[in-house]
Amino acid sequence: MAELKITQVRSTIGARWKQRESLRTLGLRKIRQSVVREDNAQTRGLIKTVHHLVEVEEVKA
C-alpha cells in the first residue's frame, strides 16, 4: 500500500479547533515537521480538513 509524506507548511495561529486537532492527530506540531502515514480514507479525511496548512507527497513503500 502507498504511503503519504505530510509536511506542515503553515502555522495553526488563527486556525479553527478542528484543524488544530486534525494536525495533532496526524502527528504534526511544528512548521516544516514531516510524518509518513499510510494512505487510507482516515488519513485522506484529516488531510482534507487541513489541506491549506500542509503539503502532501506520495512515497513509494
UniProtKB/Swiss-Prot annotation:
**Any idea which UniProt keywords this protein has?**
Ribonucleoprotein, Ribosomal protein
One biological process term in Gene Ontology? translation
MF term (GO), any: structural constituent of ribosome
GO CC annotations? cytosolic large ribosomal subunit
Keyword Transmembrane tagged: no
Q: Which InterPro entries is this protein grouped with? A: Ribo_uL30_ferredoxin-like_sf, Ribosomal_uL30_bac-type, Ribosomal_uL30_CS, Ribosomal_uL30_ferredoxin-like
The text of the family note is: Belongs to the universal ribosomal protein uL30 family.
PANTHER family, sorted = LARGE RIBOSOMAL SUBUNIT PROTEIN UL30M, MITOCHONDRIAL RIBOSOMAL PROTEIN L30
Q: How does it assemble?
A: Part of the 50S ribosomal subunit.
Spell out the protein name for this chain. Answer: Large ribosomal subunit protein uL30
Q: Which organism is it from?
A: Mycolicibacterium gilvum (strain PYR-GCK)
Provide the gene name from the record: rpmD
